Amino acid sequence: MFDVTLLILLGLAALGFISHNTTVAVSILVLIIVRVTPLNTFFPWIEKQGLTVGIIILTIGVMAPIASGTLPSSTLLHSFENWKSLVAIAVGVFVSWLGGRGVALMGNQPQLVAGLLVGTVLGVALFRGVPVGPLIAAGLVSLIVGRQ
């Protein structure tokens, strides 16, 4: 029996590799392995908790320089003294807010996830973008189409 979903996943993984977006490619390959093995029983958990686990891991990665001391507390305190750093803080707040809207949109309208993923892969492939955009892109989409 022909599995169209598997073909789509393989195509997206290939796009990931072609566009040098190894994060997307490896993620899709892991999902393909889960799909074609008995691990597929974990899909309900992955669908329910995957985004939360991913955000936790991302937050750990972002906070690691503070926790390790690589980014000293004095540098953090000085970020409130420079207008460029204050702009960076404001943009960080805005982008975090957008990401929150994006998470809500992706949960409420999962049919948009494929479009966001394809758009991210195309942005990396065609415009030398960086593959960090699906949550922020979803947040921007939510400003246009609403959260429902």
Curated annotation (Swiss-Prot):
Which parts of the chain span the membrane according to its record? 14-34, 51-71, 86-106, 121-141
Cellular location(s): Cell membrane
Entry keywords, A to Z: Cell membrane, Membrane, Transmembrane, Transmembrane helix
The record gives the membrane topology as: Multi-pass membrane protein
Predominant location: membrane
Please indicate which superkingdom the organism of origin belongs to: Bacteria
What GO cellular component is one of the record's annotations? plasma membrane
Q: Name the HAMAP family for this protein.
A: UPF0756
Annotated protein name in UniProt: UPF0756 membrane protein YeaL
Q: Which gene encodes it?
A: yeaL
